[in-house]
Design a protein with these regions (language model features):
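Long, low-complexity segments enriched in small/aliphatic residues
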Residues: 10-110
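Long, contiguous, secondary-structure-rich segments that constitute the structural scaffold
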Residues: 1-35, 106-122, 126-231
């Protein structure tokens, strides 16, 4: 669009944002430094406006009658239940160290040291024991729509019979497994629940070689590294 984008520091960026959004206007760098942080909305640059700790103070809401209106809807069961063929539930979650599909963070070496391909599938230790897999083992996760290879992560934070997987990965692309059934009104896909099964991979060396080869090829196609390079 030809808009000039030269900034000398992050404060200049923030100052421009403050001018464009009234709710941020009062949150100057000076005020943030003095108070240790400012919660928006903060409308006035003076120190009298210290931001808003919480909305609707005094119990008054931005509605016609000033009361908070709680809306609800009838429960609708998931479109795909677990069964003998796919006995575990599958949910996608966010990876702390990366953003969305890693378009902006996937090539940062520091973030790759936190977590990297092909991601993890979190499982209850009881399920891991029954399957005969340990932390870091490569496993195959399969649903009615596809399959992928990822690493096993035993954790008590997941209930027996359940799994979850972060959706940031290119090889461990968990949205290949998710259900595309739509909510009838919002048309939101049912990405957060489907049936799956986890399979043990007996030849870990072969699976590891596959992951590294695929990762190198992906990075080569992106113009990052030559295929076969150390990733």
């Amino acid at each position: 669009m030809g808009y000039p984008m030269h900034y000398n520091n992050t404060q200049e960026i923030w100052d421009e944002m403050r001018k464009l959004s009234p709710k941020f206007t009062g949150a100057t760098y000076e005020k943030i430094d003095a108070l240790g942080g400012v919660q928006w909305p903060c409308y006035d640059e003076s120190m009298d406006d210290k931001g808003t700790m919480f909305l609707h103070e005094g119990g008054h809401f931005a509605t016609e009658d000033g009361r908070g209106n709680l809306l609800f809807t009838d429960y609708e069961p998931v479109k795909e239940e677990v069964d003998e063929e796919y006995p575990m539930s599958f949910c996608t979650v966010r990876e702390v160290g990366h953003y969305s599909a890693r378009t902006m963070t996937g090539n940062c070496r520091m973030l790759a040291k936190l977590e990297d391909e092909p991601g993890w599938v979190a499982m209850n230790p009881k399920d891991c024991e029954e399957l005969g897999v340990a932390q870091g083992d490569l496993v195959r996760v399969r649903s009615r729509r596809g399959s992928l290879i990822t690493r096993c992560l035993p954790t008590e934070r997941v209930k027996p019979g359940s799994t979850n997987m972060t959706y940031q990965w290119w090889i461990g692309a968990c949205n290949e497994l998710t259900n595309t059934a739509l909510d009838p009104k919002s048309k939101t896909p049912e990405y957060k629940y489907c049936a799956c099964r986890v399979e043990k991979l007996d030849d870990q060396a072969e699976a590891e070689a596959y992951v590294q080869t695929q990762y190198a090829l992906i990075r080569s196609k992106m113009g990052i590294e030559k295929a076969g390079a150390n990733v």
